[in-house]
């Protein structure tokens, strides 16, 4: 067992369930909550306790990790009826692993501080497969001492941990990373479409690309699945669109103009309107292919 061995997870979707699985298999005591209880109940077989509210998760935990849809959901589980702050006790810390606007994150952290609860923002790069293997990249914002006191927990789920500074820093970096990913998926989709239009094999395109300086994790790992039409989701197109909304909102808050982010947002929205929202985000290839024909 660990000295800080009681962990709570609020939000047991694909990523939350994978993080929970990793922590359970690493010997932590885990209490979980999800608004749709069935998604939390499936973790019982691995030894998790299922709570009836965020308040009950907080009461049972040293560290509560929130992995929910957006800032509004973070607010609700934090400060709403039977929220985390209602379960406050000495030593409780919250780590938000959602993807939200860094400005909102700072505001939420301030509310937590006023309630006497330290909050870290701890968004991650990587999906469920990386979470279960402890290979996430964790980006941390918040009080450094609080982070260092809980670093062993983050080391359990992540192979690389970056402490970035004040609250909101982790979420700002996460948005920059997801903007990069959304663009890579689009550019790879257009390149595959161009190659096919020229009557060439996309497999050869990928082999050439991955033989050069310009290869990426996406071209190596996602590219072969894309050309086979395998869009089983690890992160849905609809979720990427939600993050692009957040990216554009953050840019506005920072008084920045990001024209490619705006264009990407529109393209992903158009793909959703074409019924592709539940595909993996790389399913944007389906939309690019369809709309490329004149």
Question: Where are each of the predicted segments found?
Answer:
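Rossmann-fold dinucleotide-binding core
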Residues: 100-178
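Helical "substrate-binding/catalytic lid" subdomain
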Residues: 169-292
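Residues in the short beta-alpha loop(s) of Rossmann-like NAD(P)-binding domains
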Residues: 36, 70, 143
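Hydrophobic residues within alpha-helices
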Residues: 19-20, 39, 108, 153, ...
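Hydrophobic beta-strand scaffold residues
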Residues: 30, 50, 119-120, 161, ...
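Rossmann-like NAD(P)(H) cofactor-binding subdomain of soluble oxidoreductases
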Residues: 54-59, 63, 71-136
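NAD(P)+-binding Rossmann beta1-loop-alpha1 motif at the extreme N-terminus of oxidoreductases
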Residues: 1-66, 92, 97-98, 128
């Amino acid at each position: 067992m660990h000295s800080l061995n009681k962990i709570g997870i609020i939000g047991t979707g694909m990523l939350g369930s994978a993080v929970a699985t990793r922590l359970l298999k690493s010997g932590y005591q885990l209490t979980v909550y999800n608004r749709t209880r069935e998604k939390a109940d499936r973790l019982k077989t691995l030894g998790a306790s299922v709570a009836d509210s965020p308040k009950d998760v907080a009461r049972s935990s040293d560290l509560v990790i929130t992995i929910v849809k957006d800032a509004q959901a973070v607010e609700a589980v934090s400060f709403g009826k039977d929220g985390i702050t209602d379960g406050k006790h000495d030593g409780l810390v919250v780590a938000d692993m959602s993807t939200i606007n860094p400005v909102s994150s700072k505001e939420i952290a301030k509310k937590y501080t006023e309630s006497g609860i330290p909050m870290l923002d701890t968004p991650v790069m990587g999906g469920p497969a990386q979470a279960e293997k402890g290979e996430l990249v964790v980006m941390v914002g918040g009080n450094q001492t609080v982070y260092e006191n809980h670093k062993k927990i983050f080391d359990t789920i992540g192979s690389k941990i970056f402490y970035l500074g004040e609250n909101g820093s982790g979420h700002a970096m996460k948005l920059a990373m997801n903007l990069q990913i959304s663009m890579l998926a689009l550019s790879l989709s257009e390149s595959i479409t161009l190659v096919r239009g020229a009557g060439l094999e996309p497999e050869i395109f990928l082999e050439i690309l991955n033989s050069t300086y310009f290869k990426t994790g996406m071209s190596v790992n996602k590219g072969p699945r894309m050309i086979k039409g395998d869009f089983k989701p690890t992160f849905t197109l609809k979720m990427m669109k939600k993050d692009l909304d957040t990216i554009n909102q953050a840019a506005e808050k920072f008084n920045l103009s990001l024209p490619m982010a705006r264009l990407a947002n529109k393209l992903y929205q158009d793909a959703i309107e074409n019924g592709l929202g539940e595909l993996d985000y790389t399913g944007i290839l389906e939309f690019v292919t369809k709309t490329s024909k004149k």
